[in-house]
Regions:
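Short acidic, glycine/serine/threonine-rich loops at helix termini
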Residues: 96, 114, 121-126, 157-158, ...
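Acidic, glycine/proline-rich low-complexity segments that act as flexible tails and inter-domain linkers
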Residues: 1-92, 309-313, 425-431
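Well-ordered secondary-structure scaffolds
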Residues: 5, 9, 14, 19-21, ...
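Phosphate/diphosphate-binding glycine-rich loops and adjacent basic-rich segments that engage nucleotide
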Residues: 148-197
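Alpha-helix C-terminal capping segments
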Residues: 51, 98-111, 191-196, 231-232, ...
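A glycine-rich helix N-cap at a beta->alpha junction
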Residues: 127-153, 223-229, 233
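Short beta-strand segments
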Residues: 113, 147, 155-158, 203-205, ...
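Glycine/serine-rich anion-binding loops at beta->alpha junctions
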Residues: 81-104, 108-120
Length: 431
């Protein structure tokens, strides 16, 4: 039996910089999920949390209350250890696509519950839905069957998983409270803990194209999430990784699937390969699998075999031709020299404006829309050489996409100190 409180007294407590008690948190999450606390009241509480923060105990209890609002998944029937990865998202971040089958090829089970894109960051499900026939929505029984048969599954979270978070996420989006670290951490971790994985690697992006552009804030978020995972009995660590430049050479849906398949075939851009292998090593070690060689599994075709099985098991055709946008245009370099910088946010916004992303939940995306990137920082370019190829089904979108790409690159002489950019791995966080 959950003790009853007044929403107003809980709002006032946080407004006045007090810590909320466990019973207060349990009640307000339960009551809001049931509709007994109004959106206006929860909006006020969320803003008070954003302004005044939460102690670790409060964040942990808030997370537990969201988990307890729904079901908890159980993978005890599997013969393999379970491990998952969560990325906070960015531009060209297609890492989940090659990573899940790679880790499965090395002996772990990967129950990857993914989401859709919003704004400039792409969604894993949107990318995979560009494969003809592929299904994002699976029942728990179907998920288990795919995991048993293939070792990896990538699908949407069911309605029964942390339903409190679904309501809170939608409310945060329209009340300017998205940025609150306690709310970000509890939103991510409530779903991941309820998912039932025994180990979790967090990929927290930072830099211009990331949700947490400030590295100090990204590290703070990573520490909070690692603590939440460990307190819940999930083996958890985080890598803070660079998102100042787009990952790989594509931003879009079908474009990123093609690039992921190149990686699984033993090729692909070096930054995608490096980060995929590093994350696979962390996941396998955390899952207790010794002696695995993910780099070899990419080269020898084992990861590709799992990919093909996984796509087929979810109704997709791994050999089907991927959608191609009807129109394209090329953006060229205005001068010659070294490409010194590329703004990931501007590239992501351009891809969104071309139709690769959405501005509201539920909006359709164009499978073939997006951007191919022909040069990255450190490359030598000549005036008139292609920098980007833009793809869309709606030619009118080119104008606004080109506006987004204005001043997205800097071209000049290579400084003696080299290019100033974030290392791919900014920090590894274990507590």
């Amino acid at each position: 039996m959950i003790e009853a409180f007044s929403a107003a007294e809980i709002i006032a407590a946080k407004r006045d910089h007090h810590s909320l008690t466990d019973p207060q948190i349990d009640w307000v999450i339960d009551a809001y999920t049931r509709g007994a606390v109004a959106d206006e009241q929860m909006s006020a509480l969320l803003m008070a949390i954003l302004l005044n923060g939460m102690e670790n105990r409060e964040i942990s209890r808030w997370t537990d209350a969201m988990i307890n609002s729904g079901e908890r998944m159980n993978w005890s029937a599997l013969s393999r250890p379970t491990v998952d990865k969560h990325s906070t998202g960015g531009v060209g971040d297609k890492i989940t696509l090659p990573l899940a089958p790679l880790v499965a090829a090395c002996g772990a089970a990967v129950p990857q519950l993914s989401g859709r894109g919003l704004g400039h960051t792409g969604g894993t499900l949107d990318k995979l839905e560009s494969i003809p026939g592929w299904r994002a929505s699976l029942s728990n029984e179907e998920m288990l069957k795919v995991l048993q048969d293939c070792g990896a599954v990538i699908c949407a979270a069911g309605a029964g998983l942390a339903p409190a978070d679904k309501k809170l996420y939608a409310l945060r989006d329209v009340t300017a409270t998205v940025e609150a670290i306690p709310l970000i951490a509890s939103s991510i971790m409530s779903k991941k803990i309820a998912e039932g994985t025994s180990a979790l690697v967090l990929d927290v992006k930072t830099g211009a194209g990331a949700f947490m552009s400030d590295p100090a804030k990204a590290k703070e978020l990573a520490h909070v999430m690692v603590g939440l995972g460990k307190r819940a009995g999930v083996k958890t660590l985080a890598l803070v990784t660079a998102m100042d430049v787009p990952l790989g050479l594509t931003a879009g849906n079908a474009l990123e699937v093609r690039e992921s398949v190149e990686v699984l075939a033993g090729g692909g851009p070096s930054d995608i390969v490096e980060l995929t292998v590093l994350l696979a090593q962390e996941m396998l070690e955390l899952a207790g699998i010794k002696g695995a060689d993910p780099a070899a599994a990419l080269k020898n075709g084992k990861a590709m075999d799992v990919w093909r099985q996984m796509i087929s098991a979810q109704g997709g055709d791994p050999d089907a031709k991927l959608p191609v946008a009807r129109e394209n245009t090329v953006v060229t370099a205005q001068s010659s020299g070294t490409l010194l910088s590329m703004d990931a946010m501007k590239v992501g916004m351009a891809a969104w404006r071309l139709g690769a992303g959405r501005s509201r939940q539920g909006e359709a995306v164009q499978a073939g829309a997006g951007i191919e990137i022909h040069a990255k920082p450190g490359d030598t370019v000549t005036a008139g050489a292609p920098l980007y190829t833009l793809h869309t089904d709606t030619p009118a979108a080119f104008t606004r996409a080109l506006e987004s790409l204005e001043d997205s690159v800097t071209i000049g002489e290579m400084p003696a100190s080299g290019i100033d950019r974030l290392p791919l791995i900014v920090e590894r966080i274990v507590d």
